[in-house]
Amino acid sequence: MKINIIYWSGTGNTEAMANYIKEGANAAGADVTVKNVAEAVAADIECDVLCLGCPSMGAEVLEENEFEPFIESIEGIVKGKNLALFGSYGWGDGEWMRDWTQRMETAGAVIVAESLIVNETPVGAECIDFGKSLVK
């Protein structure tokens, strides 16, 4: 099973989540690639599960300079793709993740796991378990 994890991180929390998720998915037998969104291309959606991570920014939105343009570039081609979402936040109640999940479902993606959100610093075990859950 091939899992691609693409993320953007400002403080390092979402990057840490990506690496823990990789650890869990690897432990469950998946072949996992982790990329910062700055290195990602639309072809990276060609995998068994695409796992996207972005923290909440500003008024609970996705990061606008790198991550949002990537999401816009794949929004028209994610129909039928298995997708999982994760991210960290410093305040608020997770509205950005609910909005993002709805947006991807509207685009036709198949959400394969309940989105993982953490306040500030991630707990490794929680992220590792999320990674394991992606391997079916």
What are these regions (language model features)?
Residues 42:
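His/acidic metal-ligating clusters that form di-metal
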Residues 1-4:
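Extreme N-terminal starter segment of soluble prokaryotic enzymes
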